[in-house]
Amino acid sequence: GHISHWHHELWANGYSSRPGRSLIPTLLGASQCAQGQPMPLAINPPLAAGGGSDRNAIPGYSFDNTHVVNHRLTVMPIRTSAMRALGAFANVFAIESFMDELAHASGQDPLQFRKLHMQDPRSLAVLNAVVDRSTWWHLPKAEGVGHGVAWARYKNTSAWCAVLARVQAGETLRVLQLDVAVDVGRVVDLDGVINQTEGGALQGMSWALKEAVQFDRTRITTQSWADYPILRFSEVPELKIHVLDQPEQPSLGAGESVQGPVAAALSNALFDALEVRVRNLPLSQDHILQALNAPN
């Protein structure tokens, strides 16, 4: 089977309230003065300019019918701002996790199911490259070990990225290996591309496994590193970056293509290991236990 209709809705604020983009003061402190200016609405640029919350909400697949709706929220008790990759992180996580769910629901291999819906040759090339160059993807898996795959083209106009994840899953998730393939067009600085991709992959892994800002109806309640854990050096997996040089193609940015695919690949690997789907980030012990104990 194949997908005939795809419907995606999201609800989000704008992402940028930085100083210098408004006719009135936008420093947070200015809104707290006795006669200060109210904070302006955060900017959310149109998708044609790269988008904000809706970045990568349009899937990179060829479906017969695609319907994407972005609901712009204008009221929030706390200020929102930019995050690396903006909405691409959440949207790619959602799209690639659900593609995995659909593959399993239809009894198809997740990798082949993706290829069934792909027509862009460079998308196929980056996905094939990460699989072909991986030394572990086709190896037998021990109990509790899972493999996951995800990919995206950043902004649907920039760099291509595909990720394979190998995890050991139980009440907690341990990442054993990550393989990443990227196509940034003509490579000007190979070390720079590798460094950006490695750093982005580890940051995406930290977001996916650990990071969460807590808040109530009026304020952020997360106060320190004690209640905002991040990835530690001891948790860094074996990480391999495979760069596809395209010397005849324009160069593309390398810094924000990998975060979303990493999160989705980890989620899909967790499902492969435990056969339970964790749909809420981070993929923490609490969320894994909730999924394991949820009624079928």
Residue ranges and their predicted role:
Residues H2-N296:
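Cofactor-binding beta-sheet edge motifs in enzyme active sites
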